[in-house]
């Protein structure tokens, strides 16, 4: 084994973190891992409280300087599968539920990044059922064709995979915006309309009928700007007289080639390290 590889503690799957997690740290586990690891399957509106609980725990046990990973992050916001699958006894997402997941995935990941989460792993890529076959997980169907959420995940990675998060923008009522800096110094704005996915608890009857179209304006230099929607379809928009008119929907869009924008809520990145090299013998023999 490579002693230089970072070590993540086994993921805690209960939020709020149970007393057991405190006992683990009281027995010296903090010397043996570099990355704190959590699982979460909650509505987006619950994530501020989740982060408060996790951050409080990390502060309490002197590990606030460790990277924070969510190695499982899934959702019940679309409810149990509504249609039959190709396997008897297994339910599958309806087309509407697939679109709901394609909305949830990028909103969760970008929101978590804005909270300072270092890595977020969506659950799960392959087709997978639980709860007596009623809960359909996975960004692939049983025939291994991809769902819309897979495509949106691909767009998210393509547009922001090498970017640095700068902070949140104020774009108007019912609209969220997040600003990123690309390796070439240009800026990318991600924006979307707020829906019940973000403000309500999980509901089994949620639908995708309303796109929640909302207009807003950016103060930018005149010229033509390019971007794409959540599925990677490109678009062009033209700014005139220092104004750029845009429309947000419930699915995120990505606007590229920006410059000079300042986030209303700047992100303050904190340097993080693993377990300190304190001379303690942390050799583990299996």
Segments from the language model and where they lie:
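Aromatic/acidic polysaccharide-binding cleft in carbohydrate-active enzymes
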Residues: 75-154, 167-175, 183
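C-terminal beta-strand-rich structural cap/linker in extracellular carbohydrate-active enzymes
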Residues: 236-274
């Amino acid at each position: 084994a490579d002693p230089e590889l970072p070590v993540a503690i086994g993921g805690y799957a209960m939020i709020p973190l149970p007393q057991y997690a405190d006992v683990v740290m009281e027995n010296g586990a903090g010397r043996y891992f570099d990355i704190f690891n959590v699982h979460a399957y909650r509505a987006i509106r619950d994530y501020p409280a989740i982060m408060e609980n996790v951050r409080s725990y990390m502060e309490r046990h002197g590990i606030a300087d460790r990277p924070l990973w969510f190695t499982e992050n899934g959702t019940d916001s679309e409810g149990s599968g509504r249609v039959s699958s190709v396997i008897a006894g297994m339910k599958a997402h309806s087309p509407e539920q697939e679109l709901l997941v394609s909305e949830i995935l990028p909103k969760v990941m970008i929101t978590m990044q804005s909270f300072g989460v270092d890595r977020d792993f969506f659950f799960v890529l392959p087709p997978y059922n639980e709860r007596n076959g009623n809960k359909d997980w996975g960004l692939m169907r049983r025939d291994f064709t991809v769902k819309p959420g897979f495509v949106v995940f691909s767009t998210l990675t393509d547009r922001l995979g090498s970017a640095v998060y700068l902070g949140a923008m104020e774009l108007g009522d019912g609209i969220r915006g997040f600003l990123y800096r690309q390796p070439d110094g240009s800026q990318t704005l991600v924006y979307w309309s707020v829906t019940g996915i973000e403000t309500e608890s999980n509901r089994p009857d949620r639908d995708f009928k309303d796109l929640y179209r909302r207009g807003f304006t950016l103060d930018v230099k005149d010229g033509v700007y390019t971007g794409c929607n959540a599925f990677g379809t490109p678009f062009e928009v033209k700014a005139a007289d220092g104004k750029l008119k845009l429309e947000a929907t419930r699915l995120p869009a990505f606007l590229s080639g920006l410059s000079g924008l300042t986030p209303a809520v700047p992100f303050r990145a904190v340097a993080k390290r693993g377990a300190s090299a304190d001379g303690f013998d942390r050799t583990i023999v299996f």
